[in-house]
Design a protein with these regions (language model features):
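Loop-to-helix transition at the N-terminal end of transmembrane alpha-helices
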Residues: 35-43, 65-79
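Membrane-water interface regions at transmembrane-helix termini and the short interhelical loops
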Residues: 53-68, 129-149, 166-175
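Conserved small/polar residues in nucleotide/adenosyl-binding loops
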Residues: 199-206
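N-terminal secretory/membrane targeting signals
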Residues: 1-24
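Hydrophobic alpha-helical membrane-insertion segments
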Residues: 11-13, 77-91, 157-162
């Protein structure tokens, strides 16, 4: 047992020393581009598992007859949010002028290269997973209380306007970033945006509001 402990400690020490020496080594721009892009893709895949978790959580909150509808709603939401965020949302989030509020409503094109340090498509993939997670928060909150097509319309608005604007305030270099605000994992930009969006929908609920009937 003691020998195994010493072996593990030795391996950990060797890894720490090698990682430190590797960090001190100057990496080429191409190498930084590859590793940074790979990091975005891996992070995006991990965040994507949140969507599966949200779907299972939401399915457990509803009656058995609604489970298939919930699954279809989550799959459709994922597709709609990805497409809309690609066309409009990404450029709107990162096109914010320094200290500004709203970016550019234009179709995004990837102009990244080795000098930028990462692929624009990898960052888009990573951020898209956060968009889907934000929409999933609202989806779970309105489970069995909203029709599927009105929710898809809401998901498109969320991915194309609501979330990108709030995201641009901090991650896009907007007024929150200029004020020193930091959000590393989306506690405000993702969860806060989803919660506020739901409360806005809830505040406008009426007996005649078709979105909430059936």
């Amino acid at each position: 047992m003691k020998k195994l402990t010493f072996i593990l400690l030795g391996c950990i020490s060797a890894l720490l020393i090698s990682s430190q020496s590797f960090a001190e080594t100057t990496m080429s721009q191409e190498g930084q581009y590859i590793f940074n892009s790979l990091g975005f893709y891996i992070g995006g895949v991990l965040v994507a598992f949140m969507a599966a978790g949200f779907c299972m959580l939401e399915s457990g909150l509803v009656t058995t007859k609604s489970v298939s509808t919930i699954a279809a709603k989550n799959i459709g939401k994922f597709a709609i949010c990805s497409l809309v965020f690609f066309l409009v949302g990404y450029n709107l989030a990162y096109g914010v002028p320094e200290g500004g509020y709203v970016g550019s409503f234009t179709i995004w094109t990837d102009s990244s290269n080795a000098e930028t340090g990462y692929s624009g498509y990898s960052d888009w993939f990573f951020q898209t997973m956060f968009v889907c997670a934000t929409a999933s928060i609202v989806s779970g909150a309105v489970a069995e209380r909203i029709k599927i097509w009105p929710f898809f319309i809401f998901a498109a608005i969320m991915a194309g306007v609501i979330y990108p604007i709030s995201m641009g305030w901090q991650w896009g270099g907007g007024w929150l970033a200029s004020g020193g605000f930091s959000d590393f994992a989306g506690s405000t930009l993702v969860h806060g945006c989803g919660a506020v969006s739901y409360t806005h929908l809830r505040a406008h609920q009426t007996d005649s509001y078709l979105v909430w009937r059936g």
